[in-house]
Amino acid sequence: MTSVKYTAIIDADPQTIWHVLRQFDSIAEWHTGVAHCTVESGKSADTGGSIRKLTLAEGGFVRQRLLSIDNDLMEFSYGHEESELCITDFLASIKVRPEGDGSRSTVTWQAHFDMTNQDATYHSIVSAFIIKGQQSLASKLMASMTIIA
């Protein structure tokens, strides 16, 4: 199993960041790697089990299922239902935590997956998507960001 994990400090309070992230169907509004997002399952976008289809900015698509969401802990997890990448058993989570006095936040985004083709390109694609997501989130909030790990 391959793992990717990036933690960033974003100069915005946790509640502001969580308000953006928790809207499972709005990723295309802030992630520059996503051109379009629709919820397919007929469930509320912020309910466990809902499925979103992402049309990626560079072409292709991914269908993702929201596995869990905890508004008190400010974290959620999701998995891939279908992807054009040579990736299986994809599970990811995003967690928001207060940093310092609470005016800044730590955002940890991690993914675990198997690659059907052991080409390192797929690890790089997932890494780039997560890093671009961290950067896009900070940009949406007009906040500075530093990746720390």
Regions found by a protein language model. Give the residues of each.
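Amphipathic alpha-helical hairpins
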Residues: 8, 52, 65, 86-87, ...
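A structural signal for short, well-ordered beta-strand segments
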Residues: 6-8, 94, 109-111
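Short, solvent-exposed linear patches
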Residues: 47-48
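Hydrophobic pocket/interface hotspot
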Residues: 17-21, 27, 52, 66, ...
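Hydrophobic-ligand binding "helix-grip"
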Residues: 29, 56-104, 112, 143-147
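Hydrophobic ligand-binding cavity/cleft-lining segments
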Residues: 1-41
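A conserved amphipathic terminal alpha-helix motif
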Residues: 106, 113-149
